[in-house]
Structures are given as C-alpha cells and as structure tokens.
UniProtKB/Swiss-Prot annotation:
Organism whose genome encodes this protein: Rhizobium leguminosarum
Keywords per UniProt: DNA damage, DNA repair, DNA replication, DNA-binding, DNA-directed DNA polymerase, Exonuclease, Hydrolase, Nuclease, Nucleotidyltransferase, Transferase
Enzyme Commission designation: 2.7.7.7
Chemical reaction(s) catalysed: DNA(n) + a 2'-deoxyribonucleoside 5'-triphosphate = DNA(n+1) + diphosphate
Stated name of the protein: DNA polymerase I
Taxonomy of the source species: Bacteria, Pseudomonadati, Pseudomonadota, Alphaproteobacteria, Hyphomicrobiales
C-alpha cells in the first residue's frame, strides 16, 4: 500500500458528490467474520486468553483488500468503501414470518466477544462501520448499491453470498475475495440458470434451509430456473400453475402459493433502509497508521503490525497499544446472538440442491450438496446428447426485416445467452468488411442436457454477383447496415447477455472497427485450449467433429476455391444462411459441451484469469499496430542481397561447381555424394537430409561448406521473410504493420504471431538487430521495450527450490557466472568469457532437457566432456534432477503437467511404446511447466498493464503494441516516458501477485528509444 494513503489523522473530510467514474466497495462484514472464524484454527491473546482468531482473520482479509484491490480480479482501487454488519437477528423479517431463521444456532461462545472487536478493527482501519437496527446487512448493502448505481458509479459487493446476487447489474458486481473472482451477470446465469433480476423469484421458489425460508417443497434451483424460463416470473407461474403437466409438481405449487409469495418477501432485499451516513461519507479516507498499529498491538498481531508499520513508515515500537473495549454477555451485539439451539421444524424444510451457506454456524460449516447435475455429470450428459443430435439446416432462419431481428434479440436477452459469428470479406480483421452475422439461441427444456437450439443469419450487404456502374448491386430484402448495427451493438455490449463465439478475437477486432465493443463473452476455442492443450486442434471444424460428430459445411462449398473463389458478399443468401447459421449453431453446442468441463477439471480460474481477459487486450494491440521505416527495409534488403551473393560465390568455390543452393537434392548430392562427408542420412524419399540440424552438426565438426550454407540460409530467410515482405504488410489506411496473435497455437501457453511473424526476428545476430531498427516510433513518441531478465531460470529456481539459484537471484548475482563458479571452481571476478558462455549454454540447455550430444554440438566439444558437464551440474544442483524426475512422473501418472498457475499441458503419448516418442514427450514435460509458467506471467502482466496505466492517467498516452516472447513493446509520448516506465516495470515484476508470491524476484529491464533495436 503506497505511503501516500497514510496519515496521522483520522478526521473524515467533506467530499464532492459521488459520480460516474467512482467505485464503491461494500464489504459484507458479517460474511467476513464467519469466513475468518471458520477458516482459521482457534487463536487466543497470550496475555489473557481472549479469543482473537476471527479478529485476526478479519484484519488480514481487510488489509489484503485495501492493499491489493487493483491487483485482484476486480482490477480497481475503490474511491469509496464501507463495511456493513448485521445489528442482530431481530429484523422486520421476523415480523413477516416468526420462524425466519428459527433454526439458526447461537454462535460459538469464543466468537461472541469478537463481534465488537471486529467493529473496533473496522474503525481502526478508518473505515465506516455501518449497521442498522431492524435490518440485515444485506438490506443496507442493497440500499447503498442502488443509490450509488443511480449516480453512475460502479459498485463492488465484497461477498459471495447468493442472497446478494439479485443486486448484480452492469454497474454492480460481487467479489469473492477467497477465490479472487469477480461475479457478474454471466456468472450468476452460469451458476443459477437465471439472470440476477430473477434471483428473487428463484429463491422464493427454492426456499432456504439455512434461513428457514419455506419456499415450495421439492423445487430446487434447476427446476426453478426451468420454470422461470418457461413462465417468465413467479407471478405468472402461480397464475398459470394449473397448466403444469407434471401432476405432483402442479399440486405442490398450487398448495404452496401463499408460502411462495411469503418467501419472496423474505428473500427480497430492501433498498430503502434509513441510513445515518450518505454515499459521500463513504469516501475512502487515508489510513491512520498509528491508530491502526495501536489496535493491532493490543490484539498482539505481530506480523500484521510489522507490515502496516512498513507500509506507513511508522516506528511501531514508539506507538502505545490502544485501549479497546470488549463486549461480553448482554453488551455483545452480533448476528444470531439471540438465537437458540434449533428446535426440529414440523415437517421440515427440504434441502435445496445447490444452496450456498454464506454465514453458517460452526456445526453447519460445510456447503450444502450440489444439485443433481455436477459439472462433470452435466458435461458428460451433454457430450452424449450432442454427439448424436442431428443438424437441421432447413430450420435455419434468414432474418430480412427489423421486426424479426428485434424479436431474436429480445429472445437472446431473455435467455441471457447467445452464440454469434460474423461473415466478412477477408480473414484479415483489420481490412475485412462486415457482410452479415449469425445468431444461435438455446431454448432450455426440462432436461438441462436436452437443449433445443435455434439459429439464424442476418445478411446485410450481399450483392447480386454483378455490381452496376452506379454503385448499387445489393441483393434484395436485406436489413440496411445503418439499421442493423445499432441493434447488434446494443446486444453485444449488453453485459447481461453472455456472448459465445469461436475465435472471438477476430470478431472483436472487426466489430471494434464498426464502433462495437463486445462485452461479457466466452470463446469456445479458448475453452478448448485450456481443457485440451496438446491433444489436438482447437478450430471449430475439428472440435465439431470431435464433440458433435458433425463436419461443418466447408467454406469452399459456398464460396468456391481457386480461381472460382468469391468473397462472401457474393455468396447466394440462402447458401450463406446454411453456412453462417450452422457456425453459430455449432459454436453454441460446443459451448454447452465444453463449458461445464472447466469447472469439472478445476480449470475455470485458468480460463478466467489467463485466457478470456487477454483476448480484448490482444485485439487492441493488433488494432494499434507498429510503424516500420520502408527506407530502412529497402536498404537492408539490398545489403542482404549483396551478402547472399558473396556467400554464393564462396559456396561455389568450396563445392567446385555452381548448383542450386536452395535445392535440398542438389545440396545433398554435393555434400554426401561428391564431397563424401560423413554423418549423412537419407529421408523416406531416398534423398539426403540437409536439415538445419544436419548442416549445423557438420559445421560443428569443422566442415566449411555446411557452415556457409547455414549462413546463406539465414541471410536469404531474413531477406524474403522480413526486409522484402514487411512493406507488403503495411496497412493502406493506418500505414502501420498489424500482426495477428494466436492464443491457442502452442501447447505451453506462449503466444504466436503471424501475418507477419514478429517473434522470430533474430536478436543475437547483427542482421536481425538491423531489421529491428526499422520498427520505429511516430514523431513525438518513443518505443519502450520492457523485457523479463532470465525469467525461465527464475521460474526454475522457484519451482525446483534450488537454494544457490534462489540466493543468486535475490542478491542480483550474474547467474551464469555463479553457475560457472559452482561447476568449474573459477572465481567470478576475472572469469574468462568462454567459461561463462559454457555455463550459460548449460543453464538454458538443462531447462530444455538437452542431451550430451546436443550440448557437445552447441559448445563444439566432445560428447564425453559434455556428459561430464551435465553430470557435474546435477551434482551441484541436485534439486533440478529431482524436479525433472517429478515432472516426468506426473506426466506419466496424469497425462499432463502444470504451470505455476495451474495451466495444464497434456502429453497423451507420454506412455508410448515407441522409445523415441516417449523420450520426446518426457523432455517436453520437463520444460513445459517452466516455459508455460513464464508465458502465464507475461499474460498476467499484459492483463494488468492497462488498468495500471488508467490509474495513473496514462491510458491514452501509453499504448502496448507488441509481445515478443518475454518482451513487451509500448509506444509512449515523449513527455510521459519517465512516468510510464516505472509503472510498466512494477506491473511486470509483480505480475504473479496476489495469486502467487515467487520465491525469487522477477526482474524487468526497460529502455526507451526511437526504434526497437535501441530500446531493447
């Protein structure tokens, strides 16, 4: 927590009115109390045995929230904050229903004195401590939330209590601090099957065994959601209950109409609670360090006292413990204090499947059982159902008028879920033109696995196939773009509707150019990638074949191929409907099958923290692009051409004849036929292999011609791939190069780039560095390159817990020199460069499971000597071998390995009977957690960068442009370089927090210059 938020005064100032842009945190204090109490072992104050376990947990949770709010899933620092408590169990609801909470037990005796202490703790944090007699904390939270929402401010309710989910809206979210998960409209829908505005009706039907809300016996959340889907709301259901076909359900509902309405009154939160403090009094004031330290010292919280003292730069030893009043017996006040041991309820209240228990007594600490369909059951049932469910293309609808489009959009809003896809004129999202879009909506039946899907296509600018001289040529009966886009925009930007797409980044970037920013979304490609990285492709066609048993219509079947290929705007609308609507249909089915698997596999956090939030970040980066200097590229192209020509002449002299150097056959005949070099092998076609590895091995053996061939290949590749090709990638309008990033192409989580590929420009060769000089900033700007230093070795030190490496990184020691000193007994001071180079090769080689043969080639030494190096390395750092063996064992046992953030990298062939295949998988399983963890770290950094820049007012003046392995490139206005650089470095170095604290520090080197090479 920065020192600037600390003060020695706790006076609350007069502040301006709450407004749009402010962010109010409402902490469910009672929920915090019970979570803290049940999560920690009993703790007493040493001096007198006073129970303080819940107080300790509460203070640490509140400290963490205040200190790290921006680094949580919420991603912002609050401008206003209040902690809300229950005054007592006697509320207006007891007047409505005397049995309300009658089954609640009195809290444990050791918790009773801690209620008052926790209120004192809240005041010590200089935070408003709010409670109102006759009302529950939830009612106070509801009142403040709705008031703040009316001002345009955003609200975060710090609680996971389902009773508060009825408040969730586009401006009101919840936050589960234990799971570091923000809860929005899609999350409510996913968990309960209804949007937040229907939660009151759902709870009224299901009742609540914890609060003794009667509900309708036998109706659980799944059934309630289905009934609400069918009838719309509780009143309509009760009015039309006689229409229900299931006899027992109909009779039960008819017999409990009054109880259902009473239950609705009990679960509906009040938003008109009389409040002593208005919104403006909830502004987050600076913390009073000495006051808080005084309270913490009284509680004997040594560790937290030290942390607070460090944060506020206070001398804790000079601060006296505070005098804190302790509430005992009749003076104590808190939830359920006036409750007795529960009496059996006549007839009982049926357990509600899926019920959550926000504030349980210790005897009821366990959550209620899950519903009949666990995520694993649901995933299995849906997979079985959709594997045989046919596709009916004749049922697809072509939407040609606004009335029909409005009806479909209304249905999507009512359902809260829609799959969509765009049809365009190009695969390049930066140049494609929107032609039409498709929608798919699920109509849920009583069986959650038997989902009927409707799909439609909305053509916008299809042409007749032949344009006229006056510029017309549009096919008849299409909705004008100007009328359709506002409706599409309203739907895609509606956070209450979950949008599902396949490879959404393309659609996101395309639609951004049309002024539409897709919000609240899922991407089936990314879900598949999280679940099954390393086991197959994640495109729509292979996923459809794998999970739905269906091969989608090939694009060439509707648009032709080769010379007959046409852009999609020239495709007949009926044929386009079959193709486009099927895409949306397939996507929605895939989502229904794949999404439950995330929860079943425990991979939801990987998807929600590392994949989904990165998608819009990458789309914005791609849209920005980067400037290249064509003159520099032209000059370099000429230099490379001259270099290639010189190498060709030298090659011809060494070969004794002219030949086609680019022909593998002719080259093989020269090397292994004419010259008779040893070490050659033939491919399956009978030709000599002239792969890069073969040539490098020959060059390492001292043969000059193969070395020249390697050099020639590098030079000609740089010329053809970069200096000649890059100018062709310059966008005609932006005049910048826009690469495209793939989130789901590698097995380890690393991003890849294409069109053009900017991640393979050599950085260690002079020619590669020259190419980087062509990537420049625009006038008045600089490029900042921020690069992680030796991140994979740091990850290795963390996961393998290698003391020598950990200490070296902590002390800022040259890690390669340290390794050389450890292995070869050479002092770091005055160490020859060759010795350090060998240690560096070993350090990085070990990460990739290098063999003695590979290391020998890399260092140009005998294989026996390389083997000795590797043996000695493992002797000096024994934990590394242990780590490697543990990863191989995990891969063999589970079929996958994991990164430090839980990403799974699958190795289905790890048990192959083929020794070569098995060995390859084992080597990959060693490196993958390290490389994947490094990739996860930079993903987290990229996600956190933009909010951090917003917080310091640099959002519009610092633009993240590129990601190249462990490096991020930014374009920054000249006057903001000094302010931006420390923010970027800080976010990157702390990217793992608060989810994970590394055992070794991450280090980022950042520089600014007018071109990429000088900045790197």
């Amino acid at each position: 927590m920065p020192n600037s938020i600390w003060t020695s005064s706790d006076a609350r100032a007069i502040h301006a009115r709450m407004k749009k842009g402010d962010h109010l945190f409402l902490v469910d204090g009672s929920g915090f109390i019970f979570r803290a109490f049940h999560a920690l072992p009993p703790l007493t104050r040493k001096t007198d045995g006073l129970p303080i376990g819940a107080v300790s947990g509460f203070c640490n949770m509140l400290w963490k929230l205040l200190r790290d709010a921006r680094n949580t899933d919420v991603g912002v620092t609050p401008t206003h904050l209040a902690v809300i408590f229950d005054y007592s169990a006697k509320t207006f609801r007891k007047d409505l229903y005397d049995a309300y909470k009658a089954n609640r037990s009195a809290p444990p005796e050791e918790l009773i004195p801690q209620f008052g202490l926790i209120r004192e703790a809240t005041r010590a944090f200089n935070l408003p401590c709010i409670e109102t007699e006759g009302f529950e904390a939830d009612d106070i939270i509801a009142t403040y939330a709705r008031q703040a929402e009316a001002t345009g401010a955003d609200v975060t309710i710090v609680s996971s209590d389902k009773d508060l989910m009825q408040l969730v809206s586009p401006n009101v979210h919840m936050y589960d601090s234990m799971k570091d998960k923000q809860i929005g409209i899609p999350d409510v829908i996913e968990k309960w099957g209804v949007p937040p505005e229907k939660m009151i009706d759902l709870q009224a039907m299901t009742g609540d065994s914890v609060d003794n809300v009667p509900g309708i016996p036998g109706i659980g959340p799944k059934t309630a959601a289905q009934l609400l889907e069918e009838y719309g709301d509780l009143d309509t259901l009760l009015e039309r209950a006689t229409e229900i076909k299931q006899v027992k359900r109909r009779e039960t509902i008819l017999a409990n109409i009054d109880m259902a309405r009473l239950s609705r009154d009990l679960v509906r939160l009040r938003t008109d609670v009389p409040l002593d403090l208005d919104l403006d009094a909830l502004v987050l004031e600076p913390q009073n360090g000495p006051k808080l330290i005084g309270f913490l010292k009284t509680m004997e919280f040594t560790t937290l006292t030290r942390r607070v003292a460090e944060a506020c730069d206070c001398d804790a030893s000079a601060i006296e413990p505070a005098i804190v009043r302790i509430e005992w017996g009749e003076t104590a006040r808190g939830p359920d204090l006036d409750a007795a041991e529960p009496e059996p309820v006549a007839g009982g209240i049926p357990e509600v499947s899926g019920e959550s228990v926000p504030m349980p007594p210790r005897a009821k600490a366990k959550s209620a059982v899950e519903g009949a369909f666990s995520p694993a059951d649901l995933a299995k049932a849906r997979a079985e159902a959709f594997a045989t469910l046919p596709f009916d293309h004749s049922a697809y609808v072509t939407i040609r008028d606004l009335v029909t489009l409005d009806r479909w959009i209304a249905d999507a809003r009512a359902t809260g879920l829609v799959a969509f896809d765009t049809e365009t004129t190009s695969l390049d999202a930066m140049q494609a033109e929107l032609v039409g879009f498709s929608l798919a909506i699920a109509d849920n039946t009583a069986d959650p696995t038997g989902t009927k899907i409707r799909a439609a296509y909305v053509p916008l600018v299809h042409k007749n196939g032949v344009g006229d001289l006056l510029g017309g040529g549009l096919a008849d009966n299409q909705i004008p773009m100007r009328d359709a886009l506002p409706r599409l925009k309203a739907l895609l930007e509606d956070e209450s509707v979950l949008k599902v797409a396949q490879n959404l980044k393309y659609d996101y970037l395309l639609l951004k150019r049309y002024g539409i920013e897709t919000r609240s979304f899922d991407d089936t490609m990314l879900i598949s990638y999280v679940l099954d990285a390393g086991t197959g492709a994640h495109g729509m066609d292979p996923l459809s074949e794998k999970f739905l048993g269906h091969t989608p219509i090939p694009y060439k079947d509707v648009a032709g191929s080769g010379k007959a290929n046409v852009t999609f705007d020239l495709v007949d609308i009926d044929r386009a409907t079959h193709y486009a609507a099927e895409d949306a249909d397939v996507t929605l089915r895939l989502w229904l099958v794949l999404k439950p698997r995330l929860a079943a596999a425990g991979l939801t956090s990987v998807y929600e923290r590392l994949e989904r939030p990165l998608l819009p970040v990458l789309a914005r980066m791609e849209a920005r692009g980067i400037t290249v200097d064509r003159q520099i590229l032209s000059r370099l192209s000429g230099e490379l051409a001259q270099g290639a020509a010189r190498l060709e002449d030298e090659i011809y002299v060494l070969a004794g004849e002219r030949f086609n150097i680019g022909s593998p056959k002719q080259l093989g005949d020269i090397l292994f036929g004419k010259m008779g070099l040893s070490g050659g092998s033939k491919t399956k076609t009978g030709q000599w292999s002239t792969s890069a590895q073969v040539l490098e091995d020959l060059a390492a053996a001292g043969f000059e011609l193969p070395r020249k061939i390697v050099d020639w290949r590098q030079v000609t590749k740089l010329k053809s791939t970069y200096t000649d090709a890059l100018p062709g990638y310059v966008h005609p309008e932006t005049k910048r190069v826009h690469t495209s990033y793939s989130l789901a192409s590698t097995t380890t989580g690393r991003l890849s780039s294409s069109e053009p590929n900017l991640q393979n420009i050599p950085v260690r060769t002079a020619e590669g560095r020259k190419i980087r000089t062509a990537f420049i900033s625009t006038p008045g700007h600089k490029l900042i390159s921020a690069d992680y230093s030796q991140i994979e070795l740091r990850v290795l030190a963390h996961v393998a817990e290698i003391p020598q490496l950990t200490k070296a990184f902590e002390d800022g020691v040259d890690i390669h020199a340290m390794t050389a000193s450890e292995m070869f007994g050479v002092p770091v001071e005055g160490m020859p460069g060759e010795v350090r180079r060998r240690a560096k090769a070993i350090n990085f080689g070990i990460i990739y499971g290098i063999s003695a043969f590979g290391l020998a080639n890399q260092l140009s030494i005998e294989r026996s000597e390389a083997g000795d190096y590797i043996k000695k390395y493992f002797e000096r750092f024994p934990g590394i071998r242990d780590y490697m063996e543990s990863r191989k064992a995990m891969a063999r046992d589970k079929g996958y390995v994991e990164t430090i953030f839980g990403r799974r990298i699958n190795y289905p062939e790890i048990r192959s009977s083929n020794p070569s295949v098995r060995a390859f998988n084992e080597r990959a399983a060693i490196n993958a957690p390290i490389q994947g963890s490094a990739a996860d770290v930079i993903r987290r950094a990229m996600i956190k960068i933009e909010p951090a820049l917003v917080e310091v007012g640099l959002a519009d003046r610092v633009r993240m442009l590129l990601q190249v392995h462990d490096e991020l490139i930014f374009e920054v206005e000249d006057q903001d370089v000094e302010k931006a650089m420390p923010v970027i470095v800080s976010v990157m170095e702390n990217a793992t927090m608060p989810a994970l604290e590394m055992r070794v520090p991450l280090r980022v080197d950042a520089r600014a210059a007018t071109n990429w090479d000088e900045a790197h």
